[in-house]
């Protein structure tokens, strides 16, 4: 009888072993479809009432109110505080590349274009007071934390027939990115791209930006957030400088550039790739990580207490197109995405960050879920990829540009704001909303307030 029980036990153990060792799910070739991803045993994040709630304040969009009025700044920060936000991110370097803080590195912003009741309007800044300092002063009185946001690898835009340092200064114009187009490699200055990106691999660009960050870190800030700390897209950068740096990285010459890497003008990967394609993606990710390390050191050299961080889009599966690996170096990217080399994970930069703002920019009809292109899913996936390397990961929606097809009713959009707070806060370390202007224009403060109140109620249960 003992032998019979032993035999049965052995059979059961064998069956359980076989069931537990089912075949792996196939990996989507470029990882751009709805792939099953590692959840990394996402431990339930402890809910706390002190989870931060960030609201972004875009410079251009809010310029009609804030460019020349401290009273308007105080008024709207009071509304943010009343709604339950704990942190503000003040954009002080819009895409023109000029700034709204004190520095000798570049000129002050003189004007911005914004949508007003009379259309797309030029708003001049005539005030002489310090824009960033005005936000800091108002925020401190309200017990709000203040973070300065900058557009990083940009130097101008096409507004007003060209605005920014790359239009004023020929030496800076040489810093702009060289794009691969169907017609060949051309400067972004000769293309219709509205934002003029700089080449992240250019040492002069990196030095300039680090010096700019040192000046910014002199302010009484809680944090600094880098936006657009990336390449334009897959078409950039194909300058001679980038080619030489890539060849040095490879340890060999490329005879047919850029075709040996990507077809001319390619904006996405095709089913076939050359031996150099994935190595090029790795090189770009390394370039961005190396810069982020320099930028962090620049900030910390002035004030070690400032939280250094980034804004990134939550769509990690395609974020390689802009040269960024925002995951943890411990997240083995190539286990899930065929576009990644075995070494791609080494250039994840989450471990360099004190805080990360994740754009969970899904439709108002897609608040809940586990995958990308749902708000909750963006946050869950981000936590899975960051793997604790960054201590503060906050995510949330763009509440003004989330329904371009106009599929949601106004009430559905209102309720999506309410629902988004708890959905995102439960999935990560806090909440992030873009942008203040949208809440103001649609008079939606009350929905943000309701959502924050419900999320905090959950934490008190």
Each language-model region and where it sits:
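Catalytic domains of carbohydrate-active enzymes, especially glycoside hydrolases
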Residues: 72-98, 219-223, 346-358, 427-431
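Substrate-binding cleft of secreted/luminal carbohydrate-active enzymes
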Residues: 343-461
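Polysaccharide-binding and catalytic clefts of secreted carbohydrate-active enzymes
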Residues: 181-352, 359-361
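Short, acidic/polar
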Residues: 65-81, 205-215, 332-349, 409-423
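Aromatic-lined carbohydrate-binding/catalytic grooves of carbohydrate-active enzymes
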Residues: 85-127
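Active-site-adjacent "subsite" loops/lids of carbohydrate-active enzymes
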Residues: 47-67, 148-219, 270-277
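Bacterial Sec-dependent N-terminal signal peptides
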Residues: 18-49
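Glycine-rich, aromatic-flanked loop segments that form ligand/cofactor-binding clefts
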Residues: 85-96, 130-189, 225-228, 304-309
């Amino acid at each position: 009888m003992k032998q019979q029980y032993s035999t049965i036990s052995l059979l059961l153990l064998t069956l359980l072993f076989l069931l537990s060792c089912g075949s792996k799910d196939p990996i989507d070739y470029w990882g751009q479809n709805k792939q099953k991803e590692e959840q990394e045993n996402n431990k339930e994040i402890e809910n706390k009432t002190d989870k931060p709630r960030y609201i972004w304040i875009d410079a251009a969009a809010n310029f009609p109110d804030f460019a020349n009025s401290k009273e308007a700044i105080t008024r709207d920060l009071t509304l943010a505080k009343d709604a339950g936000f704990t942190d503000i991110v003040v954009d002080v370097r819009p895409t023109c590349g000029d700034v709204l803080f004190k520095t000798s590195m570049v000129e002050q912003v003189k004007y911005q274009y914004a949508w007003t009741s009379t259309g797309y309007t030029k708003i001049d800044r005539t005030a002489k007071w310090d824009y960033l300092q005005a936000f800091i002063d108002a925020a401190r009185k309200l017990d709000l934390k203040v973070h300065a946001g900058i557009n990083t690898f940009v130097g101008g835009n096409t507004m007003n027939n060209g605005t920014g340092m790359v239009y004023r200064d020929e030496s800076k114009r040489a810093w702009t990115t060289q794009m691969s187009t169907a017609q060949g490699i051309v400067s972004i200055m000769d293309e219709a791209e509205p934002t003029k990106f700089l080449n992240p691999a250019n040492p002069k660009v990196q030095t300039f930006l680090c010096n700019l960050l040192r000046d910014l870190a002199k302010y009484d800030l809680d944090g600094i957030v880098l936006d657009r700390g990336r390449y334009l897209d897959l078409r950039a950068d194909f300058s001679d400088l980038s080619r030489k740096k890539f060849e040095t990285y490879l340890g060999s010459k490329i005879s047919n550039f850029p075709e040996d890497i990507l077809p001319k003008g390619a904006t996405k990967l095709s089913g076939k790739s050359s031996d150099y394609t994935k190595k090029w993606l790795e090189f770009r990710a390394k370039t961005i990580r190396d810069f982020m390390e320099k930028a962090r050191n620049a900030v910390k050299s002035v004030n070690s207490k400032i939280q250094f961080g980034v804004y990134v889009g939550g769509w990690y599966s395609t974020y390689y197109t802009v040269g960024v690996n925002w995951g943890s170096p411990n997240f083995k990217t190539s286990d899930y995405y065929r576009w990644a080399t075995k070494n791609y994970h080494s250039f994840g930069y989450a471990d360099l960050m004190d805080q990360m703002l994740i754009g969970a920019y899904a439709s108002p009809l897609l608040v809940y879920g586990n995958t990308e292109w749902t708000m909750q899913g963006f946050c869950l996936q981000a936590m899975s990829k960051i793997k604790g390397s960054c201590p503060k990961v906050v995510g949330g929606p763009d509440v003004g540009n989330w329904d371009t097809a106009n599929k949601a009713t106004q009430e559905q959009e209102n309720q999506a704001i309410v629902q988004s707070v708890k959905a995102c806060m439960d999935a990560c370390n806090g909440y992030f909303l873009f942008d203040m202007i949208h809440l103001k224009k649609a008079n939606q403060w009350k929905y943000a307030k309701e959502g924050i109140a419900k999320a905090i109620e959950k934490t008190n249960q």
